[in-house]
């Protein structure tokens, strides 16, 4: 998977996914290797942003500063789902660019991302504390997307 159509405007929130509950998943945390359940890291926050990314994905690298900006400007719970990546490459990516994520879960074979309805990387879901999808962003986040997310989470 790779986001195709980088020259197209960011597409978001297909009607079939809005207000749909994101499927629960379990995976290992990138740094600690601890097995975590998605519901347990979402339920205690009013909003959670789940960002599917890879170290080899150029658009992921390009949007990363926006995730760092979101972390600084909000108390948003940001979860990274590392897609089809090598652990050492993912850790190097985070060490070089900073870590906007409260947790980074691994998806080494891509099955979790596919089960969530992702078409490629990057993709981002804004969820409420019941894991319902408020927004889905296909492709790299834009400054406008970040403004929209900030407006939603501060409302």
Please name every model-derived segment.
Residues 1-30, 155:
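N-terminal targeting signals for export/organelle localization
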């Amino acid at each position: 998977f790779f986001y195709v159509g980088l020259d197209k405007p960011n597409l978001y929130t297909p009607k079939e996914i809005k207000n749909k509950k994101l499927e629960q998943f379990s995976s290992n945390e990138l740094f600690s290797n601890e097995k975590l359940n998605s519901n347990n890291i979402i339920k205690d926050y009013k909003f959670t942003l789940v960002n599917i990314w890879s170290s080899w994905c150029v658009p992921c690298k390009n949007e990363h500063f926006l995730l760092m900006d979101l972390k600084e400007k909000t108390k948003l719970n940001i979860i990274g789902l590392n897609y089809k990546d090598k652990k050492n490459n993912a850790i190097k990516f985070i060490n070089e660019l900073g870590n906007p994520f409260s947790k980074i879960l691994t998806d080494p074979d891509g099955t979790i991302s596919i089960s969530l309805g992702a078409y490629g990387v990057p993709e981002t879901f804004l969820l409420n504390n019941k894991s319902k999808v408020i927004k889905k962003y296909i492709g790299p986040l834009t400054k406008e997307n970040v403004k929209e997310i900030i407006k939603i989470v501060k409302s």
